[in-house]
């Protein structure tokens, strides 16, 4: 199964995000901030296909989801979609990193430390 991201269930997001990760010093919690510039779901015709209820990260292990999704507007027009995924345990961090490894392999993304 190919790792993928959806905002509308059943419709894969084709735009690749910029992802920023932060983690607490003790490793117990972390945050992933996704920024999708000109995301598919901004397209009005696609938005008519369903309701945006969150961001769903789907792979062979299952689904990770967040409801923290917002749009960025410039001059009254949507330009980007931002989503924040919070990991509340080391196990959740490890699961997220496994998803991102699969998503990166599927889409030619690379991980670089700041």
From Swiss-Prot:
The keyword Iron-sulfur does not apply. Its main location: plastid. GO terms for biological process: photosynthesis. Gene3D superfamilies: Photosystem II Psb28. It is a peripheral membrane protein. InterPro entries: Psb28_c1_sf (IPR038676), PSII_Psb28_class-1 (IPR005610). It holds the Pfam family Psb28. Keywords: Chloroplast, Membrane, Photosynthesis, Photosystem II, Plastid, Thylakoid. It is found in: Plastid, Chloroplast thylakoid membrane. GO terms for cellular component: chloroplast thylakoid membrane; photosystem II. Disulfide bonds: none annotated. The keyword Amino-acid biosynthesis does not apply. It comes from the Eukaryota. Part of the photosystem II complex. Belongs to the Psb28 family. This is Photosystem II reaction center Psb28 protein. It comes from Thalassiosira pseudonana. The gene is psb28.
